[in-house]
């Protein structure tokens, strides 16, 4: 049975966690130098259109379709600049060591042996470190690196325009659920 697995590189909704911090005049938090990871975020609307377009594709077997939004890959340092600009706030950042996730995991792991709640927190910290340090782009196996140029782009919605819409109130901030760092 033919199937298509769609793997979005990042979602706008996963990049809204620091809007309130920036609006309050607090620094945008970066891990390391803010260039450890990058992504090509895609809007829900553009992703929905991409998925619908896949329905017309005829193929045999299962295919995996990575997809990102339009434009160049965006690192957290560039996200900070976009968000501060959209909020009409000066660019202020604070760098945190990504190793902090390991430090907290080491502290909580003994408690995780006895508590499912702490076990969930330890797992969350493992996942958070991954997202803080690994790019959400296509992997170039030959060169052993993430490759923004080989990550397909789709749509027309940009993260900068999304930030402006949320900050102006013309678009509601998306629900992020329980798995959020900020």
What is the role of each PLM region?
Residues 1-89:
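Oxidoreductase cofactor-interface core, primarily capturing Rossmann-like NAD(P)-dependent enzymes
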Residues 23-26, 40, 92, 105, ...:
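Context-gated lysine
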Residues 64-65, 90-103, 125:
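C-terminal "lid/loop" region of Rossmann-like NAD(P)-dependent oxidoreductases
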Residues 83, 87, 91, 114-115, ...:
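A broad structural signal for alpha-helix termini and local helix breaks/kinks
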Residues 99-182:
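A hydrophobic C-terminal alpha-helical subdomain
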